[in-house]
Amino acid sequence: MRFISWNVNGLRACEGKGFSDIFKEMDADFFCLQETKMQAGQLDLKFEGYESFWNYADKKGYSGTAIFTRHQPLSVSYGIGIDEHDHEGRVITLEMADFYLVTCYTPNSQDGLKRLDYRMKWEDDFRQYLLSLDKKKPVILCGDLNVAHEEIDLKNPKTNRMNAGFTDQEREKFTLLLNSGFIDTFRTLYPEQVTYSWWSYRFQARQKNAGWRIDYFVTSERLRSQIADAKIHTEILGSDHCPVELIINN
């Protein structure tokens, strides 16, 4: 079973850069999007054999998530059930027969760490949400989690130490999630591989491969034996992020 996750940094813009062709080529069972930056009705995107679910931010042109699936879910939920967090279109959960699929666009702590305090609250509440699901069925979480966990996960760790996405506080929250019974699938399979999933549009960062790995598939520990592969598709353009992939043995 193939899962794809991609922060498209504006789906309408990405569609103009070949999104539909990439979608079809990747031939996923589940294709999750973050940062769609859309409202309902702005783009009529349908793919044969797929059903789609969308969560839009209240604020226009901001945030937003979507999931395309070939498999009919038992139920779908939007957000995490906490009003403070549920106006930015950041989370969609599909309940399947044997697992929950959660896609997430984690709030960025922003320049000057203006949203770091909010981010810390989000991290704790979102982790509790995942743990509540995990009590019922294994969880597959994917998305732009807006943190490079370890120094290997970004090109310039020393100069970014207190920047959004690589603060000690954000990294500690990710460690806490993993210690709660989850695994970072790519790093589990490839403990020493240096590969990034996001590059700034500035300073020719992508050409220089001065990137960050902030897009993840994180699963419940008990799915470890079913993980066949995890990939980061650095060759695919169309956004400042590239797609990441998880293959699970049924």
Regions found by a protein language model. Give the residues of each.
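Metal-dependent phosphoesterases centered on the DNase I-like endonuclease/exonuclease/phosphatase
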Residues: 51, 122-210, 214
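Structured beta-strand-rich core segments of catalytic domains in phosphoester-bond hydrolases
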Residues: 37, 42-109
